[in-house]
Amino acid sequence: MYETLTYSGGIHKGNEMRELIEDLGGFIIQENIIQMDLVINMAIPVDDVDKIKEKSDELLGKITFAPMAGTEIAIVSPTLARHHLPHAACDISEYLRRYGAKDNMIGLARGHGKGTSGISQEEKYLIEEHDVAIFALGSFKDCIIKKSFLYDDIDIPVIVTGAPEIDVDELPGADAYVSGLGRIPRRLKRGENIRALKKLVETTESILNKKRKYMGEDPPLAPSILVKDAIENQVPAIKEAYTPTPVTSQLDGVRVKLDYDTYHKDIENVDVNGRKLSDIADITKSHMYGYTLVKLLNESSIV
């Protein structure tokens, strides 16, 4: 079992932390250098967490638990127009990233308006490529309830946010509802906003833990972080990809930000513990920019 952590410190002697992660059999999920600061999201064997903490103290850094690291979350807004963005949804996105999440903003083509909103099948397919979807809706209870058709048949856990208090049973298809996050024409910096964001983090972590527990009953044939590491080491084109996190971990697979038509053969032939990746995963064309989506097969699939 692995524990996901975030290391925050200076870039001086950062290589010592990277080398320790590798020596312990861990994996770097994501690494960011911001001026003189280094932030590393990592997965470490549970028994070795104390060693990472000791090294962090030695380097005058900080270690925090990052339960969302290694997941990809969709934050869905009814539209990209200022009517719904940028404020609440963007602050939700930024806040989740503090806890290790990799999130993507998705604006529906015609999701605005209580009586005119809609969602296409293509948009649903894109949302379902993620681990969890957060639908950032508005401030009116009746409008939020009537827009439940946007997500009632989406095949991943769905969290809905809005301003009023609503019982989740009134929202068909939603796994959870978090209030206090409607349309707010400013940054979410006030006390009640921060409390609502913290509640959203707790709710998201709870749903991800439930999904992990469910997957544990029939786990993937290989951990997604192991597959991520294998692809990064065996597909040379990854080093030439300038997108953020060119191989993005998910609970049940990875998103490889390389063109499927050009590179899918290289990805299919990646060796993972002596087996071709194509033998232990479904490798398909993503609905996001034509990237390559790898979804790992469960152990029961080979019985």
Descriptions of predicted regions:
Residues 92-95, 99-261:
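Long, charge-rich C-terminal accessory regions
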Residues 245-303:
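C-terminal, charge/polar-rich interaction regions
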Residues 16-24, 55, 59, 95, ...:
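Generic non-transmembrane alpha-helical segments
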Residues 24-55:
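Helix-enriched interaction subdomains in cytosolic or periplasmic regions
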Residues 8-29, 52:
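Short amphipathic alpha-helix segments
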Residues 72-95:
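Short, low-order "capping/linker" segments at domain edges
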Residues 5, 27-33, 54-77:
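Conserved short beta-strand edge segments in small beta-sheet-based binding/regulatory domains
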Residues 1-9:
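Short glycine-/aliphatic-rich beta-strand segments at the starts of folded cytosolic domains
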